[in-house]
């Protein structure tokens, strides 16, 4: 019996689905905000939250587990060097999903996935431009 197993299938094979989620995790860690469909965003949240929790304790074993799941050295470095300490006091809920309406081509519901305490770059750039 299949009592509530695993992730949504998202109309993909298991290898494609895992690779897609891995790429989305790397993109979210690198850019701290990505645009995707709502079902993909909800699945991304389920896999990225434990990764950030793992990064709060920077042991060698945790870094190896993170590299095993991400397969990107730069993402692991940023995860443990920047995101882990940033979310050290937060007991979960590291991501925010904002619904953005529907995609033009196929009317798919779109969402913005972002890390909650990310620094605002646009405001800093506007202040620097005004100061000059």
From Swiss-Prot:
Keywords: Ribonucleoprotein, Ribosomal protein. One of its GO terms (molecular function) is structural constituent of ribosome. One of its GO terms (cellular component) is cytosolic large ribosomal subunit. InterPro entries: Ribosomal_bL17, Ribosomal_bL17_CS, Ribosomal_bL17_sf. GO terms for biological process: translation. HAMAP family: Ribosomal_bL17 (MF_01368). Belongs to the bacterial ribosomal protein bL17 family. This is Large ribosomal subunit protein bL17. It comes from Variovorax paradoxus (strain S110).
